[in-house]
Structure formats: C-alpha cells, structure tokens
Amino acid sequence: MLIQAKIPLILNWIQDQSKVKNIYLWGGTLGPNFDCSGLIQTAFLNHEIYIPRDSYQIKSFCRHIFNFKEKNKSLKKGDILFFGNKNKCDHVGIYKGDGFYYHSSGKDYGRNGIGIDTLKETNDKISLHYQSKLISAGRITRSYRWNKAIR
C-alpha cells in the first residue's frame, strides 16, 4: 500500500490516541504519553512506515512543501508541519485537513498532551503561539529501515 493511501489510517490512529488519557512526555514514544516527534514517528511506525525519531531529522527526511513565508495552500492531509525558528526545528505536528493539525504539546505552551490546533485565524492562545513558530511543511514520501528505502 502506498504511503498516501495509509494517511487516513494514520490520522485515525492519532485521533484514537487523543481520546485516551495522556500527557506530554518528553522522549515519549510508546504511548499513551508522547512528545511531539514521538507521536508522529509512532503513528507512521504503526502503519509500517519508518521515519526518523526527532523533529529536525523528520524535517530533513521529508519532501519539502513550503517555507513559513509562503502560502500553505498546498497542504494535504498527513503533511508534517515544522515549528521553531530559522535556525532550529523544535516541534512537529501532522496536518489533518481544513486548517487543523494534531500534535503533542507541553503544558507551558500547549495542551499538555495530544491536541488539535489550527492554522486559521483564531483567538486561541495556543494556536497563535504555534502559528508564530511555523517554519515549514513536508511530506513523507518514503520509508526507511536502516539502509533499505521503500516506497
């Protein structure tokens, strides 16, 4: 099955995980408590798509979609959103469509677990925080398992 065909399954898996009591856990990859990149990596891994562990590694692994100053109209469900500053990617989420995305965020600037935020105009403080830190987006177009690449 092609990666794009698995995206609805991946998004459903994340939605299911969000319904289980969870908190943000730095380094969390096993659930129910995840950090941002652990959630994304585990969601893809559960559907036999192997991607890197950390947000900056995932950013390098993805096919580039847009930079923060460009329009994000080309986003598709399952695209990966990268947050941080021009020097460093330090947060990641996955686009669920219609301007919304899933991510696991901490309690200081987030929802202390898996939540949904928006790229649309809003008054929500958490969404606004992450909108200000959006730097780019990418698309998972391949899987790797050590040195073996598959599509």
Question: What are these model-derived regions, one by one?
Answer:
Residues 20-76:
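Catalytic cysteine-centered active-site loop
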Residues 80, 89-102:
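Catalytic nucleophile-His microenvironment captured as a short glycine-rich beta-strand/loop
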Residues 65-70, 96-151:
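Aromatic- and glycine-rich peptidoglycan recognition patches
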